[in-house]
């Protein structure tokens, strides 16, 4: 199945000069959505994964069905102030400054093998901060899976050394 046909490209959104890659059409089509989830599940199948971690919000949309299919748990990564219990945090650079991500301090047990699942790999800032938190908790990042990679934004370089699966590539 050619999943590229299920990604909408919106020019000059959210700002001038940016092309936003919208996964909504993929999610709206049951066959395409389930195909994408199955592709990530298949990637994870031989990695002995204990936990899926997904950054908000679209990482939830992709990561939760993967966790369900594998019969394992899901741990959310959120912006500050969104999780009710004790958290750890990691800062990351965005094109216009610093931002912070958090996850529950007990989300990952030492030695757990984790697959990070998100919709998009661009600069790699979000996934790099997520890796930092998982490893701080003693988890092992067994891989990273994305629906879309934006080529030319050096996201792969930010996570060099980590096994990565991407279903679609688009210009960045």
Curated annotation (Swiss-Prot):
Pathway: Purine metabolism; AMP biosynthesis via salvage pathway; AMP from adenine: step 1/1. CDD domains: PRTases_typeI. GO terms for cellular component: cytoplasm. SUPFAM superfamilies: PRTase-like. It catalyses: AMP + diphosphate = 5-phospho-alpha-D-ribose 1-diphosphate + adenine. Keywords: Cytoplasm, Glycosyltransferase, Purine salvage, Transferase. One of its GO terms (molecular function) is AMP binding. The keyword Cell division does not apply. Its EC number is 2.4.2.7. One of its GO terms (biological process) is purine ribonucleoside salvage. It comes from the Bacteria. Gene3D superfamilies: 3.40.50.2020. Catalyzes a salvage reaction resulting in the formation of AMP, that is energically less costly than de novo synthesis. Homodimer. Belongs to the purine/pyrimidine phosphoribosyltransferase family. This is Adenine phosphoribosyltransferase. It comes from Streptococcus agalactiae serotype V (strain ATCC BAA-611 / 2603 V/R). The gene is apt.
């Amino acid at each position: 199945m050619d999943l590229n046909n299920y990604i909408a490209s919106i020019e000059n959104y959210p700002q001038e000069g940016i092309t936003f890659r919208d996964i909504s059409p993929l999610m709206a089509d049951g066959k395409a959505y389930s195909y994408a989830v199955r592709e990530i599940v298949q990637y994870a199948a031989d990695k002995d994964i204990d936990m899926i971690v997904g950054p908000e919000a679209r990482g939830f949309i992709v990561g939760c069905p993967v966790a369900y299919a594998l019969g394992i748990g899901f741990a959310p990564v959120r912006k500050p102030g969104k999780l009710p219990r004790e958290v750890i945090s990691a800062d990351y650079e965005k094109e216009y400054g610093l931002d912070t991500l958090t996850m529950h301090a007990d989300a990952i047990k030492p030695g757990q093998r984790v697959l990070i699942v998100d919709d998009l790999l661009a600069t790699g800032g979000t996934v790099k901060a997520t890796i930092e938190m998982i490893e701080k908790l003693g988890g092992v990042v067994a891989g990273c899976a994305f629906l879309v990679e934006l080529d030319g934004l050096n996201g792969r370089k930010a996570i060099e050394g980590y096994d990565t699966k991407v279903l679609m590539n688009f210009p960045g």
